[in-house]
UniProtKB/Swiss-Prot annotation:
Pfam families: LSR. This is Immunoglobulin-like domain-containing receptor 2. Residues 410-428, 463-478, 491-506, 628-639 have a biased composition (Basic and acidic residues). The modification Phosphoserine is found at residues 487, 594. It is a single-pass type I membrane protein.
Amino acid sequence: MPAFPTLDLDGKLGKMDRVVLGWTAVFWLTAMVEGLQVTVPDKKKVAMLFQPTVLRCHFSTSSHQPAVVQWKFKSYCQDRMGESLGMSSPRAQALSKRNLEWDPYLDCLDSRRTVRVVASKQGSTVTLGDFYRGREITIVHDADLQIGKLMWGDSGLYYCIITTPDDLEGKNEDSVELLVLGRTGLLADLLPSFAVEIMPEWVFVGLVILGIFLFFVLVGICWCQCCPHSCCCYVRCPCCPDSCCCPQALYEAGKAAKAGYPPSVSGVPGPYSIPSVPLGGAPSSGMLMDKPHPPPLAPSDSTGGSHSVRKGYRIQADKERDSMKVLYYVEKELAQFDPARRMRGRYNNTISELSSLHDDDSNFRQSYHQMRNKQFPMSGDLESNPDYWSGVMGGNSGTNRGPALEYNKEDRESFRHSQQRSKSEMLSRKNFATGVPAVSMDELAAFADSYGQRSRRANGNSHEARAGSRFERSESRAHGAFYQDGSLDEYYGRGRSREPPGDGERGWTYSPAPARRRPPEDAPLPRLVSRTPGTAPKYDHSYLSSVLERQARPESSSRGGSLETPSKLGAQLGPRSASYYAWSPPTTYKAGASEGEDEDDAADEDALPPYSELELSRGELSRGPSYRGRDLSFHSNSEKRRKKEPAKKPGDFPTRMSLVV
């Protein structure tokens, strides 16, 4: 009978066990490879404050559905500032020594630290947490966290968590430590977002500040220059070069007008005369403020147009306000002021002392001999002549006189006081009678002749009157004594060397200067003075001449009226006697008179001075043909004596100050 196979059955069972175990291992390895895996390449990252950063995160999964990515923030368990400064606690140091894998700053319960969701992404949608809304934070690529600007509170642990619906195996999270640091040892940038390469930042900032300051200063100056009524500057401004310097006078006047008191700096010129314009300066401030209407302006302001108005400052003031009327008037008057017109009118209206002696300027340039025959105008006629006053006050010459204007006496007096007066007008003058002709050129010529004898007085060759004397009217001496008492010796002893004037019939006598005038009782007495200095008085021929003259009168009547007299014979004596004494005074003669009448007349004439008023008037009444012949012979002798004298120099004539009439 056959046997059972036991050993072959055991061998087949062992082979099957090994195959099952192999397939089990393969399946297990496949499951491990296809599970979810999350990794972070950088476990610790350091970033700068206010700088952007990116936290990297990678994951792998076998699921075909999109994964959900989430970033969480967990703060440190302990402050890292103490570790950096070496101020960690002893307990934390002991725990770290016993467990090397434990970190006291990172490993702790979530209840002991701050946990916040930073951002999450599902598909293409990114959602920020409540604490990070408004910041530049997003999730880029698959799971990278990008932060635009880091803040001081961003330091801590950041966890990357990946969730898939059908892949639940594997490691789905990982963490990275972020440490935010600030710059130390360097100054912070003044302009963080602006880089200046050509200069330091502080220099650039300083230049910007200085430029802004200068800009405001320039704006202030331009505003000041364009508005001179509000302030006063003296710097030229490019905005308004025409208003470079505002006038100080207008500025002070404006301040004074606003304050209500007169200005300290007067901008109104003094009164000046303009032809055909009434005299007077600017009206006072009180008169302007009392009137409701604006002040009057110059006539050229309305008729001259824009060309006649001089360029100047215009004050932006209200014309209706009383406080600004004075300032407005002063400003307008200064703009219209013309110095050339003022000087022209001033010299046209002023009549000088010499030019007023003639009617027009052409006569003043005539020769000396032509002017001698021209008589001065009547002083009384000028006072009442309207043509004269119309020419003077109207500024017209004598040749172009218009119709005479009627000026009263008060207007004439005010005109005289307003005109400038020369020094010669200030001196004392003689009061002449009204209606009598003034001194003509003949008297001035005789006065000039007597004035020119100063140089010959010291040599003893002059027999003219003393220098510095002047002519006086015979009317002014009418109240004096006529020397009716006393003998001829006493009279001719006191009166010496007196030459009669060339025009004796005009009623003028020759008197010494006021500085050398004698007392009133002796002033009319002419004296015969020796011309030789340092010598005793010579023999007086006066008495002998008078005796010979008396004897010659009957002889002249018997001869038929001879004109030769002892006085003329005395004048024809030699130059020696003429150098000591002047010729004797002339007397009047009557041709064909009897001896009795001559003796009576001689007795009366001897009792009177030869230069008295009565003697001259008596001579004029009794003047006949014989007297005219004697006068002509006397003038011929005078002309001969003048020809013998040396010619005078032009400088011998008196100056203008000495010709005070």
